[in-house]
């Protein structure tokens, strides 16, 4: 029997690339869909059977009863938020418990992690990262410090373990002079979520995935956020706390590097970023506001305005390199329909220095642009590549030449049918 392979589907910039729609498009082709990193800080918006769902922790293959869905060891979970997300799916008629397996090695986000998140951000003042306040960073900090609680801990002597870690957090909060909080109601709901999680299959998911591969089954590793938010390779310290790149697939699921076949890198036809941190292509003018308005650039979980700018080839080349991207997926081409001229960032400049490779720190750099003609033709109803306006085809060809990777899929609208395979 031919051994199965893992394909990775990754956002390769700052997240919010439209992974949810693409995952929904991809999932019928795979037997297993697995989340390998992150937690309820990022949402994938899925339209299924005419209904809108925002999935934060649950993999996007959950709507298909024939799929196995896995929350891998590289993820962090908030039981109360997981319960709310799962109950919404159950209320819509989906029997998700038989389809969803949760790694015992995934770490838990405690209510006090969320308080710590707020306390740390407050202490940073103007240097704050701009976290979602979901407790992600403190949970991963405890993981690295080897004091965290894992999903497997809820199976035995959990109350004792919980109280010990909670006491540790409370001492840290006292040291930070951050004492104005009350988690009594939140903690009650959280404990209800812990009990709810016990309904699901808590397992050694790395063994499950490798058994599936040995049986010739196909696995889709569903990324969260984006490569430039990776804890190692992102715009540190304005990053997430997990490994969001292709390397994170191996560590976050327990699969070997040689099991990875194709790496699909998702990006938008322009650039966005949420929260703090350097963003050389950011537009503060009417063009930036137009991109935000047409692209509906507001966070799926937080509702925060996304910062907008032209496409950034310096960032994309870097992300393609560190991920080994084999196929590119371009989203939201239709958002650029109105523009007479489209700019493309090909380099960064600081004083007399011009760089075309991603610097150690992009703070203080400005974008250097080339200009291309716009197509000024609506793309949303187009379903075949042969019907693309010539200027849009030229834009795609230009990007492929610059990035040296084929753009295999182009999205020109929110509907699934507006996803065109080339």
Where on the chain are the PLM-derived regions?
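Non-transmembrane, aqueous-exposed alpha-helical and coiled segments at domain scale
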Residues: 1-422
